Amino acid sequence: MSKVLVLKSSILGGYSQSALLVDHLIGKWEDQGATITVRDLAGKDVLPMVDGEIASGLRGGDDLTARQQEMLDLSNALVEELKANDTIVITAPMYNFNIPTQLKNWIDFVARAGVTFTYTENGPKGLVEGKRAVLITTRGGAHKDGPTDHIVPFLKTFLGFIGITDVEVVYGEALNMGPEANQKGISEAKQSLDALTV
């Protein structure tokens, strides 16, 4: 039975189009018998922004403050959750040409030298191997494969850095460019999601 971790990151709650799409995928994969864990990074599972104190604490040590220890424990739990799943589904709506802050916070908690990646004589090596990722990215305009799409290259770089190179991308494009464009973008995204197997 496949285990799936879903990361929601939209700040729009019930109005979120990325949530609409990922919920479509969740329903489909649950019907196929997948065990799905949902982490709502902009809702009930919001994470703190990593500051200097937290960043220092994530390196570990024997003299951590209570806050640093709490954040290290949280990071360890997030990494364990990541490694325990076979597929990671990431929703990434475009906000001002970038990913939501809430998703970046998760990345900062799991990107740890010696834990999810390491440095070798031949360069960095990812330690989260044998996983698959699905990126669901929604945007109001049309940015796919263009110079304004920084989201997909960034997320592919991050995932590859920690060892996840099997990455599929589903685009919801031009969703704020009128009702017809929205309907077309959602329909095409759902078709792409329907083609994915768990």
UniProtKB/Swiss-Prot annotation:
Belongs to the azoreductase type 1 family. FMN binds at residues 10, 16-18, 94-97, 138-141. Keywords: Flavoprotein, FMN, NAD, Oxidoreductase. Disulfide bonds: none annotated. PANTHER family: FMN-DEPENDENT NADH-AZOREDUCTASE 1, FMN-DEPENDENT NADH:QUINONE OXIDOREDUCTASE. Its EC number is 1.6.5.-, 1.7.1.17. One of its GO terms (molecular function) is oxidoreductase activity, acting on NAD(P)H as acceptor. The keyword S-adenosyl-L-methionine does not apply. It catalyses: 2 a quinone + NADH + H(+) = 2 a 1,4-benzosemiquinone + NAD(+); N,N-dimethyl-1,4-phenylenediamine + anthranilate + 2 NAD(+) = 2-(4-dimethylaminophenyl)diazenylbenzoate + 2 NADH + 2 H(+). This is FMN-dependent NADH:quinone oxidoreductase. InterPro entries: Flavodoxin_fold, Flavoprotein-like_sf, FMN-dep_NADH:Q_OxRdtase_AzoR1, NADH:quinone_OxRdtase_FMN_depd. HAMAP family: Azoreductase_type1 (MF_01216). Quinone reductase that provides resistance to thiol-specific stress caused by electrophilic quinones. Also exhibits azoreductase activity. Catalyzes the reductive cleavage of the azo bond in aromatic azo compounds to the corresponding amines. Binds 1 FMN per subunit. Homodimer. Its cofactor is FMN. SUPFAM superfamilies: Flavoproteins. The keyword Transport does not apply. It is an enzyme of class 1 (oxidoreductase). Pfam families: Flavodoxin_2 (PF02525).
